[in-house]
């Protein structure tokens, strides 16, 4: 195949949006207080809690300032203030790297005790294994933390798929709607951008990837919030990705 790299989004691309919105996010929100409280005394050694605290201190939004004032006036403890702030970020769906890191640690607990099992699209496991056998380099770029990405594929209902991927990228690499992020990824893959196919359910992300020189495919699945592919090629199943790759040979 001419294109040797597949860069895959997760939510709405290899995994149904509803699994993330109806299972993963509610679990993380439910367990957030427990996790922060249990690890509060370890915060000098917890990079994720320190990062979340710094983000809160730097946030000058009205909601953030209200919670800070409650702490200053001794209405609530610092730990409760941070928990309230993080729940606020969840409620407004902010793409916070610190929050994503914490969610990954909480999901690790859920996957580890068997409460969570990843639900992928029916064809995902078969396609991933097929692409891997064909010699394609498979990589992930998701707003979820790398830890969360690996957990999702390690604990899928279709078995452990983690080893099929060679590279993992999250928002530590850069925002997904910035072309510079995709340029960085191409460099880390040691590949020309035009040798990389990026598959995502978000048209703005596809636009940014194409600006960086990548090929793009827009994943249009049931339940995906973004229904506008702009002028990107549309796939309704990962099997269609395989067909397009064959057509490019």
Swiss-Prot record:
* Reaction catalysed by this enzyme: 5-methylsulfanyl-2,3-dioxopentyl phosphate + H2O = 1,2-dihydroxy-5-(methylsulfanyl)pent-1-en-3-one + phosphate
What Gene3D superfamilies does this protein's entry cite? 1.10.720.60, HAD superfamily/HAD-like (3.40.50.1000)
What EC number is given for this enzyme?
3.1.3.77
Keyword list (alphabetical) reads:
Amino-acid biosynthesis, Hydrolase, Magnesium, Metal-binding, Methionine biosynthesis
SUPFAM superfamilies reported for this sequence: HAD-like
Pathway assignment: Amino-acid biosynthesis; L-methionine biosynthesis via salvage pathway; L-methionine from S-methyl-5-thio-alpha-D-ribose 1-phosphate: step 3/6; Amino-acid biosynthesis; L-methionine biosynthesis via salvage pathway; L-methionine from S-methyl-5-thio-alpha-D-ribose 1-phosphate: step 4/6
Q: Which cofactor does it need?
A: Mg(2+)
Q: How is the cofactor bound?
A: Binds 1 Mg(2+) ion per subunit.
In the record, biological process GO terms are: L-methionine salvage from methylthioadenosine
Disulfide bonds listed in the record: none
Q: Which InterPro entries match?
A: Enolase-ppase_E1 (IPR023943), HAD-like_sf (IPR036412), HAD_sf (IPR023214)
Q: Which residues, by range, are in coiled-coil regions?
A: none
Membrane spanning residue stretches: none
**GO MF, one annotated term:** acireductone synthase activity
Q: What does the record give as the function of this protein?
A: Bifunctional enzyme that catalyzes the enolization of 2,3-diketo-5-methylthiopentyl-1-phosphate (DK-MTP-1-P) into the intermediate 2-hydroxy-3-keto-5-methylthiopentenyl-1-phosphate (HK-MTPenyl-1-P), which is then dephosphorylated to form the acireductone 1,2-dihydroxy-3-keto-5-methylthiopentene (DHK-MTPene).
Xref: HAMAP family: Salvage_MtnC
The entry describes its oligomerization and partners as: Monomer.
The entry assigns this protein to a family as follows: Belongs to the HAD-like hydrolase superfamily. MasA/MtnC family.
By what name is this protein known? Enolase-phosphatase E1
- Organism of derivation: Synechococcus sp. (strain CC9605)
């Amino acid at each position: 195949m001419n294109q040797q790299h597949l860069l895959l989004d997760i939510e709405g691309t290899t995994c149904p949006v509803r699994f993330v919105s109806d299972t993963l996010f509610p679990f993380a929100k439910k367990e957030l207080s427990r996790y922060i409280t249990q690890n509060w005394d370890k915060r000098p050694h917890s990079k994720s809690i320190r990062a979340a605290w710094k983000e809160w201190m730097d946030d000058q939004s009205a909601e953030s300032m209200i919670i800070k004032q409650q702490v200053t006036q001794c209405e609530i403890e610092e730990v409760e203030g941070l928990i309230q702030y993080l729940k606020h970020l969840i409620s407004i769906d902010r793409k916070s790297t610190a929050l994503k890191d914490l969610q990954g640690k909480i999901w690790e607990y859920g996957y580890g005790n068997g409460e969570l099992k990843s639900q992928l699209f029916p064809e995902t496991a078969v396609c991933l294994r097929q692409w891997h056998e064909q010699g394609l380099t498979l990589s992930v770029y998701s707003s979820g933390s790398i830890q969360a990405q690996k957990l999702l594929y390690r604990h899928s209902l279709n078995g452990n798929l983690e080893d099929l991927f060679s590279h993992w990228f999250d928002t530590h690499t850069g925002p997904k709607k910035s072309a510079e992020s995709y340029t960085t990824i191409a460099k880390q893959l040691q590949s020309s951008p035009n040798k990389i196919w990026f598959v995502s359910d978000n048209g703005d992300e596809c636009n940014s990837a194409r600006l960086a020189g990548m090929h793009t495919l827009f994943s249009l699945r049931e339940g995906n919030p973004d229904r506008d592919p702009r002028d990107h090629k549309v796939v309704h199943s990962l099997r269609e990705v395989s067909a397009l790759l064959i057509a490019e040979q």
